[in-house]
Design a protein with these regions (language model features):
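Short, Lys/Arg-enriched N-terminal segments with co-localized hydrophobic residues
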Residues: 3-17
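Short, charge-patterned binding micro-sites
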Residues: 20, 58-78, 110-111
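Short glycine-/aliphatic-rich beta-strand segments at the starts of folded cytosolic domains
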Residues: 21-30, 35
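Hydrophobic residues positioned within well-ordered beta-strands of beta-sheet architectures
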Residues: 21-25, 71, 105
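Structural beta->alpha junctions
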Residues: 28-32, 75-80
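C-terminal binding/interaction regions
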Residues: 38
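Short beta-strand elements
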Residues: 53-60, 101-107
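C-terminal structural segments of small proteins and small subunits
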Residues: 77-112
């Protein structure tokens, strides 16, 4: 793989910035009585969030527990405020679905 480096002083273009918003959401699924019911609810949440916010999102942990779930997500863009806004709206959307309650949300925004 070839990486091209150009001196920035020769060009009057703005330096390109990539902003990554990533995190882990822990959900309370107390009303679920089986893993099958939990998977059904999570599948619904993940599909709705993907379709609404165009985000990479998946169940990442706590697969064997039916009363709690952990999902990870990632947004990529070029504006820190826009990514932060999308994350806030996504969290509100998940809570508004009333399928599971957010216990904890760990969010990190990285600028490269």
């Amino acid at each position: 793989m070839t990486i091209w480096c150009f001196p920035l002083l020769q060009y009057r273009y703005k330096l390109c910035i990539m902003v990554i918003g990533t995190g882990k959401i822990t959900l309370n699924t107390d009303h679920c009585h089986s893993l099958k019911e939990k998977r059904k609810i999570l599948k619904s949440i993940l599909a709705r969030v993907k379709n609404t916010y165009n985000v990479s999102i998946a169940e990442i942990d706590l697969n064997d527990l039916h009363r709690i779930a952990a999902i990870g997500f990632a947004f990529v863009g070029n504006d820190r405020r826009a990514i932060n806004s999308k994350i806030d709206k996504m969290l509100e959307f998940i809570e508004s679905l009333s399928l599971a309650h957010i216990i904890e949300a760990q969010v990190e925004i990285i600028t490269i």
